[in-house]
């Protein structure tokens, strides 16, 4: 699917972990696909993330002792233009239902529940298992074209 078509009608986009890692670490396989999306985030789409996105992004940098990379993730995800949605009891209950309905791992179900609570129309990921979810437009990075 073409990136512009994929983002048509999207005003709030949930960012799963992988696309953020591709963007910050400049992954050569995916950076040409995520850059245009992140440019749109600065212009006319609101990015939404959860504590799971932030903590999963930080794991590799912390494990390797790369404080500059750790800070780069924090800088991207904690900027004023990014909506950071905390996971509360209501989201946890929704995640349990989503996990059962779609047979997802709990972190994925929490991410989807957070996106729905935040009013996102689309969810950017590279996890094809999430394509089972029907309440959101699931955008798989590896299936997008510029």
Short names for language-model regions:
Residues 2-4, 82-124:
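Active-site neighborhoods of divalent-metal-dependent phosphate/nucleic-acid chemistry enzymes
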Residues 50-52, 87, 141:
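Conserved beta-strand termini and adjacent loop/short-helix elements that scaffold enzyme active sites
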Residues 9-10, 43-44, 79-80, 101, ...:
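Structured helix-beta-strand junction loops
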Residues 1-49, 62-75, 128, 143-146:
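Short, well-structured N-terminal submotif of metal-dependent ribonuclease cores
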């Amino acid at each position: 699917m073409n990136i512009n078509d994929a983002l048509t009608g999207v005003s709030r986009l949930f960012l799963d972990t992988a696309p953020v890692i591709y963007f910050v670490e400049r992954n050569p396989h995916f950076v040409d696909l995520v850059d245009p999306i992140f440019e749109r985030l600065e212009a006319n789409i609101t990015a939404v993330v959860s504590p799971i996105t932030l903590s999963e992004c930080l794991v590799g940098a912390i494990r390797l002792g790369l404080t500059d990379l750790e800070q780069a993730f924090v800088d991207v995800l904690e900027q004023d233009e990014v909506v950071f949605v905390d996971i509360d009891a209501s989201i946890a209950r929704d995640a349990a239902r989503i996990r059962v309905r779609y047979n997802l791992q709990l972190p994925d179900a929490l991410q989807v529940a957070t996106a729905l609570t935040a009013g996102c129309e689309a969810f950017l990921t590279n996890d094809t298992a999430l394509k089972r979810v029907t309440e959101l437009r699931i955008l798989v990075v590896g299936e997008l074209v510029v």
